[in-house]
Amino acid sequence: MKKILSLLCLAAAVLFSAGATEFPQLNPFSCTSIMVGKKASTDGAVITSHTCDSHYRTWVEIVESIEYANDTTVNVFKNRLHTESAKGSYRMSLKGSIFQPAGSTFRFVDTAYPCMNEKQLAMGETTITGRRDLVNPDGMFMIEELQKIALQRCSTARDAIRLMGELIEEYGYGDWGECLTIADKNEVWHFEVFGEGKDNIGGVWAAVRIPDDHVGVSANIPRISTLNLKDKDNYMASDNVFEVAKKLGYWDGKETFRFWKAYGGGKKAFSVREYYILNKLAPSLGLEYDSEELPLTVKPEHAVSTEEVMALLSETYEGSKFDVTKNLKVAVKDRETGAVDTVISPAANPWMSRDTRNLLNALKPGAVDSYRLVAVPQCAYSTVIELHSDLPDDIGGVLWLGFDNPAQSPRIPVFCGTTSLPDCFSICGQYGYDENSIVWKFRTANKLATVRWGATKDQINEAVQYFRDKGTREEAFVRDQYNQILAAEGQEAAQAYLTGYTADFAGATILAWEELALRFWAMFARGF
């Protein structure tokens, strides 16, 4: 009852602006990926990233290299991204098997959408849906299985794209439209794929290289536009990319072919997230939100650091025209001067539930606008991956892994040379509370913080920044220690050091967020 009264009091005190908003259904496939070319970054790193913004598994493991003495076959699965553990089978089904050549696979980090291997090949992902008529469930591959095979077998982005294209042609693609942001230590590519339609087990895809001095963004909408397939250094596509569009009536063969328009079927090639991020990195371009499409990439007006990508993935548009709390203001009286000011209510937060937003808008239409934020509370995990051509693979590639809301959680460094993760990483936290699952180590404090975000925000932000600074500050030291151990004791000992560092860093973040949770419980001891 107190909670309901609090909401009503907040609503009554709000200073509203006009303009009713209808809230759309939450896209269950929502994700965001930012790419940075090596000449656009502050230190020459190639960067890719991913926010996995839905009810996907939170368990993560590092899969070791597998030695195949002879040619054989390996199984391909569906829905492994919903399993409760590495050995679990909940909702998972066997789709078939494919040829596996003799030889060794590469070690890789097995997130719901596998993200990095030991050779500094890395991937981000966003579901771009596309036309329903293109989906053929008889195709063998879901996108995450393509990623897994590519990370096990490939060391460069181009090779990964070629291999996935070959697998799609031979075995078929059975998923909705997907985008992968595929990076290695030299370059990053924007790859989009769709099914070939109900009558064909195959697929259609295109890939565009992000210029070295540019950045790109994918956020659940097809983005690839025109294709210059004569420029083999910067464009790749399936052989049927034009044929399928004409056959299915998506392109008349006369107007300029735009991949996003043919296969996506939408009216625009971007959303608020692409617009906000690109506009923030290249404001002088004057990008227009009401345009039909934006450039796939832009040249940033300053060098972009790994830390800035982390910050962009934490965006809630605070202070901008897209700020969803901008109308939720209350009058505050200064106790000393008696002056009255209006401020954002401490009870307002960017992640208000649908019920809360609907209540506020029922009391006064237009109280809360609806924009899809970059950082959302339903995020399972997120990645920012930096790759360096001037460093050995073991320490050149770093996955900065976060769980739960990217705007509220710390990031844990996992190096290419890290060979295992603490036990708490292996337990999914999506099917109930489990104190042993790493996501719940952060989720408790994060969710409590939103009860009165105005009072807790600074504490969360300070903790996030502390570990961001710690990771950046210690990165050079860790690499130096690795090199010293490598020279004195060999690679196995050096990798053990990296593995221990990841575990220690994770432990420090867990303790900090457990302390925050206790602090917030004390803060709200008398009620919310």
Give the role of each language-model region.
Residues 6-15:
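Bacterial N-terminal signal peptides
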Residues 1-4:
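Positively charged n-region of N-terminal signal peptides that target proteins for export
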Residues 22-142, 163-309:
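A contiguous strand-loop segment
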Residues 246-390, 394-395:
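Glycine-rich, aromatic-lined ligand/substrate-binding cores of catalytic
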Residues 346-484:
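Substrate-recognition/cap regions that form aromatic- and gly/pro-loop-enriched pockets
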Residues 468-528:
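Histidine-centered catalytic/metal-binding microenvironments
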